Structure formats: structure tokens, C-alpha cells
């Protein structure tokens, strides 16, 4: 392996812009080596076709305890020792556990949820309207972007309505770019403790929700332990939540930067699905999703990767691949899509389980927000938006708006 490899993760170029290194590597060295926090080396894959190969190759493993698996931080290395959930499993265990919760997230199930999603969005916008902005701008993240996905996933899990606000606060602490590691860790534990109590309750008194299903269909027959049910619930709760909060805020900021496309969406809210599709390509809010280790020697692009070497495939870089997307650095909700998929939700068997739910939520948000508040504006200069730190996933910490 090469010495003198650049340190990874890269920092973003500026607020919403992906790291400049990705474009350079796609052009000159699309499969190259990078140095991780502990001095170890891994292969970084930056082009769309190679990222898709990494996501689907059976010669690569998702199991974090395997030799060479690339962890990006000390806390990641620690987390890898915990009992895994399906996102960190290979076949056949992966599909076996994933199928326990998959029925909740099918297109059909999400369609049945649509009235609840719409009601949640409407209620939160109505609350914002009642508060008004006569006393100054309102933080769209706190009042809207955070509670929308939080309330929906909590309700699916079976959290009583009275606890939604408290749990949403805990979730905000663990995902907010400005919280300390200790605060985030304490909030994590609060959520795990809460879910453990809920699992105990649902074992005795099941209802119609994900945790009850796990208890009735999996824990009671002895297929999984109670601790597994808690970890699966926690995964579903946290995996996409910060990403969704960020995508809502990034969507509003992006429309403010593209007034012509905002005018289009206001005039025709049925364009929301294509806006969401482009949003998820342009701002790949979880930049480092696809990590593997080689089970055997394998060619990736033009490089030979040896057994037990780590691989990081950047779906964020793949979504800006010039060979796949025309003018990839332009935000264009009217773009003509190539046959290849954008990779905002990953690719292959490990593709995000809640993709249909996430798109339904985002589509509902952007088809409703500007109908309810046609005069909604970002209340700070666009160059002064408070983006997450440049070494974290792209997002917005708070977004003052007036309407």
C-alpha cells in the first residue's frame, strides 16, 4: 500500500459543497489509497460504476469485526465491537434480520401511511403559523425539519404521543453538529434505555407497531434476544433521522439559492418528487455510507485490492460523476435522468430500507410547505447559513426563516 496517502475523511470545500478532492480523484485516480484516523490505509472509490460494484460484490464484506474493515473514528472502532444489526451483516444473516422489519417500509405500506405523513406536516406547519414570526425569525430546523421525521419514525416504532417531544429533544442533542461527544453519548444512552423499557412493555402488552411485531414474531419464539429488538429499533430511529432533518433544511436553502426553480415548485407542487430526486443526488447527506473489507483479492476499477484490505466507496462522489450526470455540480430539478440510479440511498442489497418512506416525507414537505407559506424566506444572507462543521456530513444546524 502507498505511503503519503491523503488523510480521510476529507473536509467539505465550503458550507454545502462536497470535498474538492473527489472531483480531482475521479479525473486522475478514481480508486486510490487514503489514510484513516489511526494511521491505517484503505481504498477510496469515487466513480459511480465502481461504487456500484463495491455495493454489490460478494467478494467484499460488511462485517465490521473483520480484519481491515475501515473505521473512520475511534468511536466507530468502539461501536464495531457491539452486537451487529442487519446493516453490518453479510448474507444470509443480513436479509434474515432485515426482513423482520422490511414490511413496514414497502411502497404499499408507505402509501397507507401517506395520510398520517400529510397530517404530521400540516399540524407542524399550523403550529408554526400560530407562533408566527412577529417577534423575529423562526428556526425551521427546530420547529419543523426535526419533528417531521422524528414524529413519524417514533410513531411507527410505537412510542406514545406524549413522549414524542422529549425523545425528539434527545435525538436533536445526539445529531446536532454543535453537541459535545459526551452530550451525544448521554443522549444515545437515554434513547437506548427508553427503547429497552418500551420493549419490555410491548412483550407484555403488544400493539400495532414495529417494536410489538419484533417482540411477538421474533423475541417470544426465541429468534432474537430482547437486546436485539432494542438495537434494531434504535437503528431504525437514528439511521435516517439526522439525514432527513438535514435534507429538509438543505432543500429550503437550495430553493432560496435557485429562485426560478422555487417559482416552478410553488406554481406546480406536483413537481415535488422530481425536486426530491435531485435534492438527494445533489446533497448526499450521508457521505460515507458504503464501507467494506475484501474477503479475497479483487479488482476494483484498475486496482488490485488484496484480501483484508478496507474499501470506502463514496456515494457522495458518485452522485457528482461527470460520466453519469450532465453538469453534476448544477442543481437542476428538471434534469434528464440517465439510466443509472443516483446513489443518495445507497445501492444493492444494503440500499436504505426506508428509502420509500424518506422520499414520501420529503415529497410531502416540499409539496406543502410553500403552499402553506408562499412568502417563506430564509432570514439570513445565504452566505451566512449555519452549515454543519466542514468535517461532518453536510447539513444545517439552524435555519431562521420568516413567512
UniProtKB/Swiss-Prot annotation:
Induction: By nitrate/nitrite. Its EC number is 1.7.1.14. Its cofactor is heme. The keyword Cell membrane does not apply. Residues 1-21 are annotated as: Disordered. Gene3D superfamilies: Cytochrome P450. Changing residue 286 to V/T: Impairs catalytic activity. Changing residue 64 to E: Impairs interaction with NADH. One of its GO terms (molecular function) is nitric oxide reductase (NAD(P)H) activity. Cyanide, CO, and oxygen strongly inhibit catalytic activity. Belongs to the cytochrome P450 family. Nitric oxide reductase which is involved in a dissimilatory reduction of nitrite. Acts as a nitric oxide reductase. Is able to reduce nitrate and nitrite to a gaseous form of N(2)O when oxygen supply is limited or discontinued. May function as a detoxification mechanism. This is NADP nitrous oxide-forming nitric oxide reductase.
Amino acid at each position: 500500500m502507498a505511503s503519503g496517502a491523503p488523510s480521510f475523511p476529507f473536509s467539505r470545500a465550503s458550507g454545502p459543497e462536497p470535498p474538492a478532492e473527489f472531483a480531482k480523484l475521479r479525473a486522475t485516480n478514481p480508486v486510490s489509497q487514503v489514510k484513516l484516523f489511526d494511521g491505517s490505509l484503505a481504498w477510496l472509490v469515487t466513480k459511480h460504476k465502481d461504487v456500484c460494484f463495491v455495493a454489490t460484490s460478494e467478494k467484499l464484506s460488511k462485517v465490521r469485526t473483520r480484519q481491515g474493515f475501515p473505521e473512520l473514528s475511534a468511536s466507530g472502532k468502539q461501536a464495531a465491537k457491539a452486537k451487529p444489526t442487519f446493516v453490518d451483516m453479510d448474507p444470509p444473516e443480513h436479509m434474515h434480520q432485515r426482513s423482520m422489519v422490511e414490511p413496514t417500509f414497502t411502497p404499499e405500506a408507505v402509501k397507507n401511511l401517506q395520510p398520517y405523513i400529510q397530517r404530521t406536516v400540516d399540524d407542524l406547519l399550523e403550529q408554526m403559523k400560530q407562533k408566527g414570526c412577529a417577534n423575529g425569525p423562526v428556526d425551521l430546523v427546530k420547529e419543523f425539519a426535526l419533528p417531521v421525521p422524528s414524529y413519524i419514525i417514533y410513531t411507527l416504532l410505537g412510542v406514545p404521543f406524549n413522549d414524542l417531544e422529549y425523545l425528539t429533544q434527545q435525538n436533536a442533542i445526539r445529531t446536532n453538529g454543535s453537541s459535545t461527544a459526551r452530550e451525544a453519548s448521554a443522549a444515545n444512552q437515554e434513547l437506548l434505555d427508553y427503547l429497552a423499557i418500551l420493549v419490555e412493555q410491548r412483550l407484555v402488552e403488544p400493539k400495532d407497531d414495529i417494536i410489538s411485531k419484533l417482540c411477538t414474531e421474533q423475541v417470544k419464539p426465541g429468534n432474537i434476544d430482547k437486546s436485539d429488538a432494542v438495537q434494531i429499533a434504535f437503528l431504525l430511529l437514528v439511521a435516517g433521522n439526522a439525514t432527513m432533518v438535514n435534507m429538509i433544511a438543505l432543500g429550503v436553502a437550495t430553493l432560496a439559492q435557485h429562485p426560478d426553480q422555487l417559482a416552478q415548485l410553488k406554481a406546480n407542487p406536483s413537481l415535488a418528487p422530481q425536486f426530491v430526486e435531485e435534492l438527494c443526488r445533489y446533497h448526499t447527506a450521508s457521505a460515507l455510507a458504503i464501507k467494506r473489507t475484501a474477503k479475497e483479492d479483487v479488482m476494483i476499477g484498475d486496482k488490485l485490492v488484496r484480501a483484508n484490505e478496507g474499501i470506502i466507496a463514496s456515494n457522495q462522489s458518485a452522485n457528482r460523476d461527470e460520466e453519469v450526470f450532465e453538469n453534476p455540480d448544477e442543481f437542476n430539478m428538471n434534469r434528464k435522468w440517465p439510466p443509472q440510479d443516483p446513489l443518495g440511498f445507497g445501492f444493492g442489497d444494503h440500499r436504505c430500507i426506508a428509502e420509500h418512506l424518506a422520499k414520501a416525507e420529503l415529497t410531502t414537505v416540499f409539496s406543502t410547505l410553500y403552499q402553506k407559506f408562499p412568502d417563506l424566506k430564509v432570514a439570513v444572507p445565504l452566505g451566512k447559513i449555519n452549515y454543519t462543521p466542514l468535517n461532518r456530513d453536510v447539513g444545517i444546524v439552524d435555519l431562521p426563516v420568516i413567512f
